[in-house]
Each structure stands twice: as structure tokens, then as C-alpha cells.
Amino acid sequence: MTSNSHVKIGIIGGSGLDDPDILEGRTERYVVTPYGKPSDALILGKIKNVDCVLLARHGRQHTIMPTNVNYQANIWALKEEGCTHLLVTTACGSLREDIQPGDIVLIDQFIDRTTKRVQTFYDGQPTSPPGVCHIPMAEPFCSKTREVLLEVAQGLGVKCHTRGTMVTIEGPRFSSRAESLMFRQWGADVINMTTVPEVVLAKEAGLCYASIAMATDYDCWKEHEEAVCVDNVLKTMKENANKASSILLTAIPQICQMDWDSTINAHKSMSQSSVMLPKH
């Protein structure tokens, strides 16, 4: 089967997973959006002959804390660059015994505990699109894209949990033990600081969005386990980053071989029909 020329993959790399060396023939492009500048330059190139655009969520030097990431500009820039899919990576803490440090989780739901972030492109600013967008979030992630990632992970022999609920906290601090225990009671499986509002904005943009979450620790709910700290997170990420990279490098050419017309049209249709325009 020939490759699908309509598919372009945006990759948003989280902690330790934003290496531009995965791209062939790469060039950099600095852009400005109606929402300001993205976290860093867009890095354009190919992965196994598939057009891709890489963006470091926290900047290439990891200088932007989760609250200050310009999620609006990041998603807008990737959409304007022609991306149809967003494959993102994120470090996370595990809230479940069976999700061990180093495991991959293909999250399918989220709980939002952020407090300081704009979650829509339709924010009433003069340079923003008109109207109010009430985007449905019953299924926040693209199920078809998730299925591809799952099949690839299983084929590579990577330990991968097929679904999971991510609770996104504001940060940059980690949770208290009481919070961590509460999130477990709520049904959350993993915890991070970036999934929201990124997934919401991708849904508004009509993109096929899926997240590869890598557990680095057990947060702090396990009383006899060392609580999460930066050193342990970075150590686990360094040891296991190749898992996420392998999934991406294998999945991207497979995605490009598939027919995405109906899926892309469905995402776009939902995005467009969710906007209530002002009456004249």
C-alpha cells in the first residue's frame, strides 16, 4: 500500500523525549501564532519518509514549567503546519501497584485538577476565532490512533497498559500523600502536569491525538516506597526513553499507510459543530 500523502505527524516531546535526532533532513522554523510563540522552534523532517514536526513541550532546555507552557500556541502552530495527528509523550507517576516504573500507559481518560490554564482557542480575545466552543470530551483521545500504538507496543514486546485515567495537576510541585491517596480513590491510574489542556485543545483543533505515558515512579501514596523526586524521575526516563522512541518510530510509518479520511473528517466535524457563533 502506498503512503497517505495527507498524513502529517506532530510529535510533542515531554521530559527526556524530545530528541530532534529522530528526524531525517531536519530544518527549524520559528513561528508566531495568534496566541504567541510556541514553546520552541518547530523542527521539520521525516521519519521513515513520513513528514513529521517535532516540538519540545517545555522548550529544548526544559526551561518552561507546566503552568507556563503555551499550550494554545503549541497546538495552533502544529495544526497550521498541516499536522493531522499528534503523538505525544509524557512522564507520569503511577497510582496503581500494577503500573510499575518503566511501564507504558496508553491513557484514554483524564481528570483535570489544573487551575491556571486556558483550555480553549475561543477565549474571547480579538485575535481568536469568534464564538464559544463546547467541545465534547467523553472520548478525549483518538481511539484509532491509540489502537495503532497499542499494536506496535505489543509487537515490540514493550509492557503496555491498554488504557488508563490520567489526573493532571497544576504543579510544579508534586502531590501531598493525602492528594495522591484521594486521586487513587477517584479512579485515577497515573498522574502528570501536562495532559490538560493539551488534549482539550487538540480536540478543538480536530486532530487525532494520542499520548504515550511513561510511569517513572509511584508518586507518594505508597508509604514504604521512596516518594517521587526529580532525580528518580530523570533516572527512570533516561533508562526507558528508548521504549517510547521505538513505539513512535515503528508506529509512524504504519499510520501513514492507513486510510484516515473518515476519522479526520469526524474529528473536524465534531470540532466545527461544537462552536456556538454570536447571533447578528
From Swiss-Prot:
Q: Source gene? A: mtap
- EC number in record: 2.4.2.28
Quote any Pfam family the record assigns: PNP_UDP_1
The record, for SUPFAM superfamilies, names: Purine and uridine phosphorylases (SSF53167)
Could you tell me the Gene Ontology terms of the biological process aspect for this record?
A: L-methionine salvage from methylthioadenosine; purine ribonucleoside salvage
What Gene Ontology molecular-function terms does this entry list? S-methyl-5-thioadenosine phosphorylase activity
- Top-level taxon of origin: Eukaryota
Upper lineage: Eukaryota, Metazoa, Chordata, Craniata, Vertebrata
Q: Which residues bind phosphate?
A: S15, R57, H58, T90, A91, T194
Q: Per the annotation, which location comes first and is thus the protein's main one?
A: cytoplasm
Protein name from the UniProt record: S-methyl-5'-thioadenosine phosphorylase
Q: Which residues form a coiled coil?
A: none
What family, per the record?
Answer: Belongs to the PNP/MTAP phosphorylase family. MTAP subfamily.
Describe which pathway this protein belongs to, using the record's wording: Amino-acid biosynthesis; L-methionine biosynthesis via salvage pathway; S-methyl-5-thio-alpha-D-ribose 1-phosphate from S-methyl-5'-thioadenosine (phosphorylase route): step 1/1
What NCBIfam families has UniProt attached to this entry? MTAP (TIGR01694)
Q: Which residues bind substrate?
A: M193, D217, Y218, D219
Q: Which GO terms describe its cellular component?
A: cytosol; nucleus
Keywords in alphabetical order, please: Cytoplasm, Glycosyltransferase, Nucleus, Purine salvage, Transferase
